[in-house]
C-alpha cells in the first residue's frame, strides 16, 4: 500500500482539501501546522478541531509540525515537514499547485547543482526579498516560469529542494476552484481566504466546509485577539534583538511603529519594506508574541489523531520511531507548548492544547 504524505495548515479545512485527500491513493499522513501559521498568524480554529475535520474526510494520521517548523519561511517549513514525514515512512508527497510541472526533475536539478544555486543567491542584491531571490534562482538554473500569484507552486519548489536525497516521489495535484487569495464565494471549492472572510455567512460555510459544525461552533481566532498582548510584549521588552530573526533595524522599526498602530495590519504595513516582506514581518511579530528565541526542534513526533487504518501503520513504527501520543510531566517541545498556552489566552472557550491531551481516534473500516 502506498504511503502518501501531505503538508498542510487546514486553516480551515475545506472542500478543496477534501478533494486533495480523495484524489491521492493509499494511506494518507498529514503533517499539519499547530496553532500558529506559516504566514504569521494565529490559526482560525485550534489544531485539535482541524485534525478532527481532516480525519473525518480522508486523512489517516495527523501529526503536528513543531512551532519552529510551522512558523518559518517556505524552505524551512518544507524541510522540517518532509523530514518528519520521511520518518513516518512516506513514499510520495502530494500537494496542490497552480502550475503542474515536473517537480521530480527539479529535485534532480537541485541534487546536482545545490552548491551553485546557493552561491548564486548570495550574489543577488539585498534589496530583493528571499522569495524574489529564490524565484530568480529557479528561473536561471531550471527555467521555471512564474505567473502572477502562485503561492502553492512556490511552496512546491521548496518541497523539491527539501526532497533532494530523500527518495520520495512528488505528486502535484492541479489546484481546483478559487485561487489561493480569492475572497469570491461563488465557487464550489472556495478558498480558505474566502471562508475566513465570510465566517458569518453560515449558508456559504455549510456548503464550503465538510463537517461545518466543527468550524461554526468553535472560537474563531485572529490577530485581533492577540494584538494587545503583542503591544505589551513590544513596549516592555528590554531587547527585541534577543528574539529570533530580529535585528537592530527591525527592532527600531517595530518599537516606533507600535506606538502609532491600532491593529496588526497597520503595524505590518508600517514595518514592512521591499527587503522585509509582510509575511516575514508577521512571522517575526509571532516570535515576539511568544518570546521565541534560538530555534530548537524536538526529537519526538506528536500524534494529533488517527483512524483505524492509521493506527495499524503507527503500530509498525512505534518501536523504531519516537512517537508522542500524550504530553505529560515531560515536555514534547517547550516552544510549541508555550505557543499553545498563549494561543489559549485569546479566548476563554479554547480548551487545554497540550498537557494531558490524547490523539483523536476515528474508527473506520478502511483497513485494506
UniProtKB/Swiss-Prot annotation:
Alphabetized SUPFAM superfamilies for the sequence: Nucleotidylyl transferase
Annotated compartments: Cytoplasm
Binding site for ATP: 7-20, 96, 152, 175
Key word RNA-binding present: yes
Catalytic activity, reaction form: cytidine(34) in elongator tRNA(Met) + acetate + ATP = N(4)-acetylcytidine(34) in elongator tRNA(Met) + AMP + diphosphate
Entry's EC annotation: 6.3.4.-
CC annotations in GO: cytoplasm
Keywords: ATP-binding, Cytoplasm, Ligase, Nucleotide-binding, RNA-binding, tRNA processing, tRNA-binding
Top-level class of the enzyme under EC nomenclature: ligase
Keyword hit for Nucleotide-binding: yes
Molecular function, one GO term: tRNA binding
Record-level GO BP terms: tRNA modification
Domain of life: Bacteria
InterPro entries for the chain: Rossmann-like_a/b/a_fold, tRNA(Met)_cyd_acetate_ligase
Family per similarity comment: Belongs to the TmcAL family.
Purpose: Catalyzes the formation of N(4)-acetylcytidine (ac(4)C) at the wobble position of elongator tRNA(Met), using acetate and ATP as substrates. First activates an acetate ion to form acetyladenylate (Ac-AMP) and then transfers the acetyl group to tRNA to form ac(4)C34.
Protein name: tRNA(Met) cytidine acetate ligase
UniProt source species: Streptococcus pyogenes serotype M5 (strain Manfredo)
Amino acid at each position: 500500500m502506498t504511503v502518501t504524505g501531505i503538508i498542510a495548515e487546514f486553516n480551515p479545512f475545506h472542500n478543496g482539501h477534501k478533494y486533495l485527500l480523495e484524489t491521492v491513493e493509499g494511506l494518507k499522513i498529514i503533517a499539519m501546522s499547530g496553532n500558529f501559521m506559516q504566514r504569521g498568524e494565529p490559526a482560525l480554529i485550534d489544531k485539535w478541531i482541524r485534525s478532527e475535520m481532516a480525519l473525518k474526510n480522508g486523512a489517516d494520521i495527523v501529526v503536528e509540525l513543531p512551532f519552529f517548523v510551522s512558523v518559518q519561511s517556505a524552505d524551512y517549513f518544507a524541510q522540517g515537514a518532509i523530514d518528519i514525514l520521511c520518518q513516518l515512512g512516506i513514499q510520495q508527497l502530494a500537494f496542490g499547485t497552480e502550475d503542474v510541472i515536473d517537480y521530480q526533475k527539479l529535485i534532480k536539478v537541485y541534487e546536482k547543482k545545490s552548491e551553485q544555486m546557493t552561491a548564486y543567491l548570495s550574489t543577488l542584491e539585498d534589496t530583493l526579498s528571499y522569495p524574489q531571490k529564490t524565484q530568480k534562482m529557479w528561473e536561471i538554473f531550471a527555467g521555471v516560469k512564474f505567473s502572477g500569484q502562485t503561492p502553492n507552486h512556490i511552496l512546491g519548489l521548496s518541497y523539491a529542494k527539501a526532497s533532494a536525497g530523500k527518495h520520495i516521489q512528488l505528486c502535484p495535484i492541479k489546484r481546483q476552484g478559487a485561487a489561493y487569495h480569492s475572497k469570491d464565494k461563488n465557487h464550489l471549492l472556495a478558498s480558505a481566504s474566502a471562508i475566513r472572510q465570510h465566517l458569518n455567512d453560515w449558508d456559504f460555510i455549510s456548503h464550503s466546509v465538510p463537517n461545518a459544525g466543527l468550524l461554526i461552533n468553535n472560537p474563531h481566532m485572529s490577530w485581533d485577539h492577540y494584538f494587545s498582548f503583542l503591544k505589551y510584549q513590544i513596549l516592555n521588552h528590554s531587547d527585541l534583538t534577543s528574539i529570533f530573526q530580529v535585528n537592530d533595524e527591525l527592532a527600531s522599526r517595530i518599537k516606533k511603529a507600535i506606538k502609532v498602530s491600532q491593529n496588526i495590519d497597520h503595524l505590518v504595513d508600517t514595518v514592512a519594506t521591499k527587503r522585509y516582506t509582510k509575511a516575514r514581518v508577521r512571522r517575526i511579530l509571532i516570535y515576539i508574541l511568544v518570546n521565541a528565541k534560538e530555534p530548537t526542534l524536538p526529537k519526538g513526533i506528536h500524534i494529533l489523531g488517527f483512524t483505524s487504518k492509521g493506527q495499524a501503520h503507527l503500530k509498525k513504527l512505534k518501536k523504531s520511531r519516537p512517537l508522542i501520543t500524550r504530553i505529560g510531566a515531560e515536555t514534547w517541545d517547550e516552544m510549541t507548548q508555550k505557543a499553545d498556552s498563549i494561543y489559549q489566552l485569546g479566548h476563554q472557550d479554547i480548551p487545554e492544547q497540550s498537557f494531558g491531551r490524547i490523539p483523536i481516534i476515528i474508527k473506520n473500516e478502511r483497513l485494506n
